[in-house]
Structure formats: C-alpha cells, structure tokens
C-alpha cells in the first residue's frame, strides 16, 4: 500500500493542487460575500450568521458539481462518454486546471468590476491598484494554465472594441490603459504557444478553423451535451433573463461561456495535437463561470423571495443545482475508487 502512495514530484504536485484548489474556494467565498453578502444580510435580519454559512456552502459545493449523467448502463442518444464531449466545471483529473483556478476567479471578478469603471476620466489613476491586481491575477492564471486566459482575452477584447467603436473612439485612451494590463499575459502566451505554430515531425502547425469537427469525434449530440453540462445555468438564465441587463458580472459570465463555446467549436490545433481538443479546457472554464454567475443571481433571488411563487421558482433552481452536485459527488467518489475520468 505504501508503494502506491505518491512521492517526490507527484506528491508535490498533489499538495500544490490541493492547496490552490482550497485557495480557490476561499477566493470564491470572498467574492460571493462581496457581491451578494449585503443583500443576503438585509433579507435575513436577526440571522447574521446565516448569509456567511450560505455563501460558504455554495462556494465549497461548486467545486464538486459536474455534468449531469445517467446511471451506469444507461446511454443517452449521441453521448458516448460521461465526461468526454460533455465536459464539466470540475475536471478533477487535471492538476493544472485546478491550480490556475484561484487566479482565474480573482481575475474574472476584478475585470468584471472594472468594466463599469474603466471608461471614467482618470480611472487608471483612481483605480490603479485594481488595474495592477487584475494584471497580476491574469498573469498568474496564465502561467498555471493559459486556457482561461485565452477565453477571457477573447471576450474582453471583443467587448472593449465594441465599446470603443460604439463611443466613436471617445474612450480610446481608457481602453488603452486597461489594455496595458494584458501585456504581461500576452508575453507569456507567446512564450507558451510558440510550439503550436512551429511544424513538428513534418506535420502542419498553427490554429485551424472548423465547425465542431474535433468536438464531434467525442460526442455526436452537441445540444444535449451542452444541456448536460450547463443545465443549471441555462435554467437560471431562463427564469432570470432580466438580470443580464442589470448585473454586469452575470452578463460577463455568459460572455465568457459564449466565447469558450465558440473557441471549442470553431478552433483546433493543427498537426498531432488536433485530437487532444485542447480548446475544451477553455470551454470548461466557461462552464465554471456560467455556474458562478448563475449562483450569484440565484443567491440574490433567494434572498428576495418573498412570495410563494418566487420561493417555488428558487427551489426549482436549487434542485437543478443539487442534481449537478449529486452527480459531481458521485463522479468524485469514482475517482477515489480508481475509476477513469472519461
């Protein structure tokens, strides 16, 4: 038994992943408290302890949700595997994904917080500390695993360019100042991806364009796969769609998901890396932040639920979340029993 325990490099990687994943839970708890804590305390007078317990429970539980899947032996149409082709917010088998997550969470929230502010006059001076923190968080996430960064940069770039054209370049300098925060990350991305664009072993290199070709090798029913992966966020969106206009963080969470889906569906690495489907890692970050945004909205809606109808709708949404959580706990238990991830 002793010989089967991880030692040396493996043990160090396992401990680092555990500590960083724990840090991600703490980071998410802090962000939930910051953005919905006050509203929950207002909605729960006389129970000062309850909002903190609620956000803490939600923060920890989110790291155990997974895709929804049927019991063993039952197969859904077009779904070949439990994980492959469907994907999950928590790929427990990938240490670098988990290691990058605390920095990804902090970078996501910091950028979402800056979005309503960066176009103000002298925002880069007034919020200079936030600009620096965002740049550092994004760089650290990139150094651990660049998959999240590619998605965030894509979504943020389109959003900032659209705002700049819409304002007829009146916000040109504020856009440049916020763009400077991305420069350290761009340098690291160029270093990490230099091998992708260099042909190896006589094979073509670079990034190719497709329409789901790689994804369809693992799953032939993409609509169902999407529903199994983000069923809970989709339900919250359908019942709270007006929050997209009111809540910039919630809106940005869906922009992140949308960009991650487009990249996974339309892009692939040429050559021997094609079937590795490395753009799926960015998609899994998109799934994770779709859950984060949905939980922010649901926590807020739960606190405001003052009628039987609103309480019933909140309960339905929590049951959908519980479904993902039960599947995730069973999926995690399978890992502990030696089951394969796919």
Where are these regions (language model features)?
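Perimembrane helix-loop-helix junctions
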Residues: 152-182
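Membrane-interface micro-motifs in multi-pass membrane enzymes
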Residues: 50-115, 221-226, 277-287
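Membrane-interface alpha helices of multi-pass inner-membrane proteins
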Residues: 130-146, 152, 157
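Loop-to-helix entry region of an early transmembrane alpha helix in multi-pass inner-membrane enzymes
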Residues: 5-26, 48-52, 56, 94-98
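Short hydrophobic alpha-helices at membrane interfaces in multi-pass membrane enzymes
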Residues: 113-139
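Transmembrane alpha-helices and membrane-interface helical segments
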Residues: 23-31, 106-113, 155-163, 234-239, ...
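Transmembrane helical bundles and short interhelical boundary loops of multi-pass, membrane-embedded
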Residues: 183-189, 194-342
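Transmembrane-helix motifs of polytopic, lipid-linked glycan transferases
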Residues: 15-45, 60, 106
